[in-house]
Amino acid sequence: TDLLNDDQPYLVQTRSGKPMVSVSYTSEVNDFSFLRQGLVAEGGLQMFQEQFDWLYEESASSGRFMNIGLHPHVIGQPYRIRALRDFIRYAKSHDDIWWTTREEIAEWYLENHESHIPI
């Protein structure tokens, strides 16, 4: 969904009665922050790493997900892409990270958290 409120998936009830999994989006940890905040690569990298570090620490007790909103015309600029490259290297240096899609997160949640789903 386009909800911006969590770093864990959860169910949203719909009018049809069939639940929908919310895998929240973030507008804060987003390459547009480079534009809004006037960040250079180092500032963007710091933002990505600080978000990751906090969520990684919290994930020791319960899973978390992190997404970064990326737009080719923003992050793809030569003076910005380094932040993404360096962040990916940084995150890959940590154990137990699942590189996946939002769709796969939703599917996993539905398959593994049946007790949360009202029938």
Please place each PLM-identified region on the residue numbering.
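Active-site-adjacent pocket scaffolds in enzyme catalytic domains
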Residues: 1-62, 113-118
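C-terminal domain-boundary segment and adjacent tail
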Residues: 45, 49-119
